[in-house]
A protein has these predicted regions:
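Conserved subregion of the PPM/PP2C metallophosphatase catalytic domain
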Residues: 1-22, 26-32, 36-194
Length: 194
């Protein structure tokens, strides 16, 4: 199951996250609920500076101690500071977000395992987080839609509204698979710097 969340941490900071729990059905839903409650508890009880790498490291320890080895979740966590326009983030196995800046695309990399990275977001930057239900659907020839196609599609449609981009992505994936039925959960989160 897919997961996303966002919270206002302070008058100047917004926290957002996305994850993807392995598997389907009840067991995946329960693990997703565990991830959500653990994450929310951690950020709601924080005081002062919240270190994204520490949050994800603690979340990983808790999940590792309380779940079967074959169960896991990816997780991306970002905190945007509206005063400085800085995004602090870490990534625990999730697909790297796509940053569109001045018509060019790049992937947000991280420093080491759950390392905290940061980037200054510029006006008109577009950040796209997504789950593998977007990039991994297959066509009749067993070819995945893929990250490269997604990047090109988002670059081409970055001028559209957020809803317009989401609709373009969903339609492209449907056309790729030749079906209106989803092969997996599909989650997109778009953030723009004004």
């Amino acid at each position: 199951g897919d997961y996303f969340d966002f919270h206002r941490l302070s008058p100047k900071e917004i926290c957002f996250s996305m994850g993807d729990v392995a598997g389907k059905g009840i067991s995946a839903a329960l693990l997703m609920a565990t991830v959500q409650s653990s994450f929310r508890s951690r950020i709601q009880n924080h005081t002062g500076h919240l270190c994204v790498s520490e949050v994800v490291t603690e979340l990983n320890k808790q999940l590792y101690a309380n779940t079967a080895p074959e169960k896991f979740s990816t997780f991306f966590l970002g905190i945007f500071d509206e005063e400085t326009s800085t995004l602090r983030y870490t990534n625990a196995g999730h697909l790297p977000p796509i940053l569109i800046r001045n018509g060019e695309a790049s992937l947000l990399a991280v420093d080491g395992q759950y390392g905290e990275s940061s980037i200054l977001l510029e006006p008109k930057d577009l950040l796209l987080l997504y789950t593998d239900g977007i990039s991994e659907p297959q066509n009749d020839y067993d070819e995945m839609y893929g990250e490269d196609r997604l990047i090109e599609l988002v670059k081409k449609n970055a001028h559209l509204s957020d809803e317009g981009i989401i609709n373009a992505v969903m339609e492209a994936v449907k056309q790729w698979t030749g079906s209106d039925e989803l092969q997996d959960d599909m989650t997109l989160l778009i953030a723009r710097r004004s």
